[in-house]
Amino acid sequence: MNSLIPGSLAAVNALVLQHIACEPPGVFEDVLRERGVALHRVEIDEGEPLPDWRDFDAIVVMGGPMSANDDTSLPWLIEEKRLISEAVRSGLPLWGVCLGVQLLAASLGARVYPGPEPEVGLLPVTITEHGRSDPVFAEAPTELLTLQWHGDTFDLPRGAVRLASSPAYENQAFRFDRAYGVQFHLEVSGEMAREWAEVPEYVSSLARTLGAEGAPAFLAAIEERADSMRETGRALFEAWLDRVVAPAGAIAS
């Protein structure tokens, strides 16, 4: 997949919603900084307040160990989903990853629920027919190698378009207006994955799927394939910036 010719997006203000320190935007943040985007990060799990989404041109919603349904124990999720719903239904571009795609689905009225088994591993996803004609996913290979590390899944929101799927989980990526969500990770470095292996919720899903002795080989495999996956992630994210975020800014102005 070829990246678009990079250009400055210095007029763009992006809001990054982060749910745990070890799940930053990774290569997506690299792209934002390279393109001159002004980045405002909110570490929601640390109690940082949510700003007014109207002050931003795009939102990036990252992953985390919590469920999109944990409203009782994490009441800030209610406000976050309200922000996402208002922003997306108003046409603001959004990019959601793992928990981020689940929060996007929930904010659009879809059900988020535990899957039959955690999906953990370096696993392929297939671009759908709609994905092959999508402005962001059209130039992607038909099959992508991705890092999967999740236990919950979601129903496709009404009005959304499925862009990618896998044998285990039908909904791997979707588009709703200018909002895109992906269940998988393409932003992660080997170092980030090693940090994830210290998070209790992630350790549990890792043990259930790969066994107690499976972690070292899994982390070594991520280390080996991280650069290739990050290049794919970079290309998709740049396509979203250039074909969704930038045109939306031109329309808004």
For every predicted segment, state its role.
Residues 25-27, 70-72, 105-107, 157-158, ...:
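Short glycine-/acidic-enriched loop or helix-start segments at secondary-structure transitions
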Residues 1-90, 207-253:
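N-terminal beta1-alpha1 cap of cysteine-dependent amidohydrolase-like domains
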Residues 15, 40-42, 60, 95, ...:
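Hydrophobic/aromatic beta-strand patches that form the interior of the parallel beta-sheet core
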Residues 26, 74, 128-135, 199:
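Serine-centered coil/turn micro-motif
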Residues 186-222:
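C-terminal helical/coil "lid" or tail adjacent to the Rossmann-like core of SAM-dependent
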Residues 108-192:
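Pocket-forming structural segment of enzyme catalytic cores
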Residues 31-34, 75-79, 112-113, 164-165, ...:
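Glycine-rich, phosphate-binding/catalytic loops in enzymes
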Residues 61-131:
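Cysteine-nucleophile active-site neighborhood
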